[in-house]
Amino acid sequence: MKSTRPFHPTPVITIDGPTASGKGTVAALVAAHLGFHLLDSGALYRLAALASMRYDIAAEDVDALVKLIDDLHITFREGCAQLDGVDVSNDIRAEAVGNRASAIAVHGPVRTALVARQRAFRKTPGLVADGRDMGTVIFPDAMLKVFLTASAEARAARRHKQLMQKGFSANIDDLLRDLRERDARDSNRAAAPLKPAADAKLLDTSALSVDEAVDQVLQWYRALGQPA
């Protein structure tokens, strides 16, 4: 059956999935392999939050927030989030920044502005976008949509390892409980619930290495007749 998906000259690969599924790592490596631009949609909200704090813009000042988001200079390179050319990957993980991101995201105009910024990352030669609704909401016409997941136990183990490597203490049972609670919230929310697009490729990475997951995404891309 011939696809009815609208044609766009700039290819997009979307990689959606739950927390700690490895989608960010896979997306960054796929983008690097293909020479594509990279979008970490989750970090985008935190970058906007960090910028609002640095410029003393109140979380309730919707007009100022929208203008700020429109003017932000944001790039993602090799897993690093840059604001005005400076790596702020660690800064945006602060609890205060996360709280501010939640506070500004409640405003409809702010979410609309952030959606526009996400779509603006679509530039030649192509884009790899990772998040939760990239294939369903932001880029419904993406050439390749991947929904990457893993068991809650595997994801908790990965997150625990990441935190320990960064010098943080963590209890794996607490992480597992938090992941399951977040999965339930994300899957049942009214706006853009976490779910695979109808035409997404499902990739369970519970028993896969990062390289194996990347290779599978690239195989799917090649199968579309694209050089990879």
From Swiss-Prot:
Residues the record lists as binding ATP: G17, P18, T19, A20, S21, G22, K23, G24, T25
Primary enzyme class: transferase
Species this chain originates from: Burkholderia multivorans (strain ATCC 17616 / 249)
A Gene Ontology term for the protein's cellular component: cytosol
Alphabetical list of InterPro entries matching this protein: Cytidylate_kin, Cytidylate_kinase_dom, P-loop_NTPase
Coiled-coil residues: none
Protein name according to UniProt: Cytidylate kinase
Top-rank taxon, per record: Bacteria
Catalytic activity reported: CMP + ATP = CDP + ADP; dCMP + ATP = dCDP + ADP
Gene Ontology molecular function, alphabetical: ATP binding; CMP kinase activity; dCMP kinase activity
Location within or outside the cell: Cytoplasm
A biological process term (GO) from this entry: nucleobase-containing small molecule interconversion
Keywords assigned: ATP-binding, Cytoplasm, Kinase, Nucleotide-binding, Transferase
EC number: 2.7.4.25
Any one Pfam family match given in the protein's UniProt record, by short name: Cytidylate_kin
